[in-house]
Amino acid sequence: TYTREILNYLNSTDKYEIAEMSAYGEENDPRAADIPWKFYGVMPSKNAPEEVKKHYSSVPTYQFGEFAFERVCLDFKPDVVCDIRDFWMLDFVERSPFRPLFKWCIMPTVDARPQARQWIATYQSADACLTYSDWAGGVLKNQSGGKIKYLGSSPPSAHPAYHPIEDKVSLKSDFKIDPTVKIIGTVMRNQRRKLYPDLFCAFRKFLDKVENKHDYMLYCHTSYPDLGWNIPELLQEYNLSSYVLFTYICRETKKPFASLFKGAIMQSPFTGRYGATLA
């Protein structure tokens, strides 16, 4: 989503010739027909020769773009290559024989410290480095001894669309939430590495200590079912069924709404029909 917004903005300026290399797009992908910039799909097409498909599957990092990167460089001849993703998805760019011919701007995910030394070394080789937070920038500067060419943080929340709404009372009322309730929120996918059990345990301890536990709610913008935790089981384990809100989306109207957990699918308040899914 973040990369898409950046591409749309850059394209709107009419200042740049833009190309997108899509890791999970196919060569000659029909979904790219309406994209207003040059598009390169990394995956072999469905009718590609079997030896090409086997070659693509032979190296794990090929799926992140390494499979097509040299071909794209030869065809597009980029002046700047931008990578907004994790280390293991971008490190092949450092090894490219065409690396001296373009500037490399990266925005790696830095959400823990210390970072691996190999990661820091790769980040140092980039011509420019951005982060999602000032804290992450501090981690990179400290570990590299100031050698990383750090430009600053550029989070998606810098966009005006994410500007905090000052009238929180009206906002809560619009979502049918008690405006007097204080909300603690989190946005993270339901994966095993995301510590939902610890979060629910900590929130339960918090509720047990405050004077009026009904003054607080936890809001989770997450997914279920997914590859991670059994959300309803955790809610029962920590007796939080009445204290945790989730984002559901009505598939017919595309409108989001907040609700206590009602399963993976619940009735939409907009249509009265079942089909609203946990975001």
Residue ranges of predicted features:
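Short hydrophobic "strand-cap" motifs at the C-terminus of beta-strands
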Residues: 107, 132, 154-157, 186-190, ...
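A short helix/loop element that forms part of the nucleotide-sugar donor recognition site in Leloir-type
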Residues: 162-177
